[in-house]
C-alpha cells in the first residue's frame, strides 16, 4: 500500500486530470462536472443521476458511486494509475464507459 502523502498527491493529480477531461467533454455530453472540497461530481441534464468521485485516504482508494454501484479503484504502481481490479480499467477509461452507459451514447470520449 502506498503511503498517505503519495496517495493524496496521486489521487489529487488523477482527479484533476479527470475533471479537465470531463470539462472538455461537457459540451457534447449532456452532463456537467463540478468539484467541491475534493469531491468530483458529474450531474446529468435530466437530473435522474449523479456520479460521485472521492478519494478514500484510509484505504488508499478512489471511489466512484455511479449507476447504483460503488467502484473502488486501487493504485497500480506499475501503471502509475488508479485501476479497477476487477476489469483493469483505469479511472478515465472506467469513467468514459460509465458515461456512455448512463447517456446511451457510445461517442463520448474523454481525452
Regions found by a protein language model. Give the residues of each.
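N-terminal intrinsically disordered, cationic/polar leader segments
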Residues: 1-111
Amino acid at each position: 500500500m502506498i503511503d498517505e502523502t503519495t496517495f493524496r498527491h496521486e489521487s489529487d493529480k488523477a482527479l484533476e486530470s479527470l475533471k479537465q477531461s470531463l470539462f472538455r467533454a461537457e459540451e457534447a455530453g449532456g452532463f456537467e462536472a463540478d468539484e467541491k472540497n475534493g469531491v468530483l461530481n458529474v450531474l446529468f441534464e435530466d437530473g435522474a443521476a449523479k456520479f460521485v468521485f472521492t478519494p478514500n485516504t484510509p484505504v488508499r482508494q478512489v471511489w466512484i458511486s455511479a449507476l447504483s454501484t460503488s467502484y473502488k479503484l486501487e493504485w497500480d504502481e506499475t501503471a502509475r494509475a488508479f485501476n479497477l481490479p476487477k476489469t483493469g480499467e483505469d479511472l478515465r477509461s472506467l469513467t468514459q464507459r460509465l458515461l456512455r452507459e448512463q447517456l446511451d451514447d457510445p461517442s463520448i470520449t474523454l481525452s
